[in-house]
Amino acid sequence: MSETFDVNAAIYPFPARPVPLDVDQKAFYREKIKTLLKQRDAVLVAHYYTDPEIQALAEETGGCVADSLEMARFGNNHPASTLLVAGVRFMGETAKILNPEKQVLMPTLNAECSLDLGCPADEFAAFCDSHPDRTVVVYANTSAAVKARADWVVTSSIAVELIEHLDSLGEKIIWAPDRHLGNYVQKRSGADVLCWKGACIVHDEFKTQALAQMKALHPDAAVLVHPESPQAVVDMADAVGSTSQLIMAAKTLPQKKLIVATDRGIFYKMQQACPDKELFEAPTAGEGATCRSCAHCPWMAMNGLKAIAEGLEQGGVMHEIHVDEQLRQQALIPLNRMLDFANELKLQTKGNA
């Protein structure tokens, strides 16, 4: 598999974590959010990687906790006129693409994603133009502009099936932006894949040596790995899958101990799914390195209670997602192709973002 545009050396401008709230402040903002949701005819949709208290509030108020695509689909089916998306910016954009008639708010518009940042639309378009014979498949973790340039959008839960399908048609693929997931689907499918060289700052930090040491401490534990992780880490897994697939694996695997290599935000729903099991965070860094994300996306951490309340209360340019209508229509085409493909396979599309 060929690769290009190595962004390993990129120094992303990590945001400051929200100032911790005390018990009284948390209670105040929870009640304020509940009131504002009713006043604005809004529903709170949160990603699996947000902090547990945010996921709990989404459930308590009739919202949902899911991956980025399911968040958008939930918003489409929910009667609320406003969606408050607790996640990162591309998730808000996806919600707006699929729900143009609704107001989409976010706690902050500065919640980025290293995969999105590592795939600038102009550079990616030029790269695609230089390989006109290839079908362009992009991961959901991309901007609206990158989606608009693609032939297909895909989530990790159906990535292998889609690439196998395209390969059976004799098509050669451009895959973007995650090189580890691209490598995973190429190995599984055997397709001709030209891969953009992006990476998730969280999953890229999992290391085999540290994981092997933890496995030695817990030899009876199963290892669950998201395919955005390096191939050597994936090779150590008992189960590989998207966020939703890892939660399902946690329920169905016989082991009572689970070592989980993905963002630790997933532990909230995973522990709900299997309360009788013991969960361990897979180690990040190791092998002489220090962790930067330390198994939690710094941009997901921006979705605090105070920020959610401010997003609902203030709206406007600081919190509302807008997508150019022409761009939205272009991005909707590959998104709908993915949804149609998933329906034909009789799969419920649940990816990672």
UniProtKB/Swiss-Prot annotation:
It comes from the Bacteria. One of its GO terms (biological process) is 'de novo' NAD biosynthetic process from L-aspartate. InterPro entries: NadA (IPR003473), NadA_sf (IPR036094), Quinolinate_synth_A_type1 (IPR023513). The keyword Magnesium does not apply. Gene3D superfamilies: NadA-like. Its cofactor is [4Fe-4S] cluster. Keywords: 4Fe-4S, Cytoplasm, Iron, Iron-sulfur, Metal-binding, Pyridine nucleotide biosynthesis, Transferase. PANTHER family: QUINOLINATE SYNTHASE, CHLOROPLASTIC, QUINOLINATE SYNTHETASE A. Catalyzes the condensation of iminoaspartate with dihydroxyacetone phosphate to form quinolinate. This is Quinolinate synthase. The gene is nadA.
